[in-house]
From Swiss-Prot:
ATP binds at S9, L10, H17, G89, I90, R91, E99, Y123, L124, H125, L126, S127, S128, T129. InterPro entries: Cyt_trans-like, PPAT, Rossmann-like_a/b/a_fold. Substrate binds at S9, K41, L74, K88. It is found in: Cytoplasm. Its cofactor is Mg(2+). It comes from Renibacterium salmoninarum (strain ATCC 33209 / DSM 20767 / JCM 11484 / NBRC 15589 / NCIMB 2235). Reversibly transfers an adenylyl group from ATP to 4'-phosphopantetheine, yielding dephospho-CoA (dPCoA) and pyrophosphate. Its EC number is 2.7.7.3. Homohexamer. This is Phosphopantetheine adenylyltransferase. GO terms for cellular component: cytoplasm.
Amino acid sequence: MRRAVCPGSLDPIHNGHLEVIARAAGLFDEVIVAVSTNYAKKYRFSLEERLEMASETLASLRGIVIEPMGAGLLAEYCRQRGASAIVKGIRSSSDFDYEVPMATMNRQLTGVETVFLPAEARYLHLSSTMIKEVEGLGGDVSDYVPRAVLRRFHEGKETN
């Protein structure tokens, strides 16, 4: 079985993530969407909420497993899960410059390869940070995020 890992904090998951994950699902028998937590970052959504939004959004795709990644090295996580590849979406040359050293280290640590998928043009500008900023300032992000995320944004406004 060809298994890959798509890692990300997914805070929140957006249509650019979905596009990369769907393409990865076409390349591999199983894709583990590993939802990560960096304790140095401040998150809008809890890990549980991010897992729920990803699960709801990706339910129609075959071969997708969604789970928390936990602490530790991505290369070691891939080895433990039997994944031969890491799939990363690339929006720009700066993404590539950032990802290549990590891909090289991951390959040297455990032999896991990194597959880079260029983002579709309509998603080149998307980032979770930008989506949170636009939404927080009252902008309409409905073209950029799945319904599960929109619902969470609206629920957050109702409780504030």
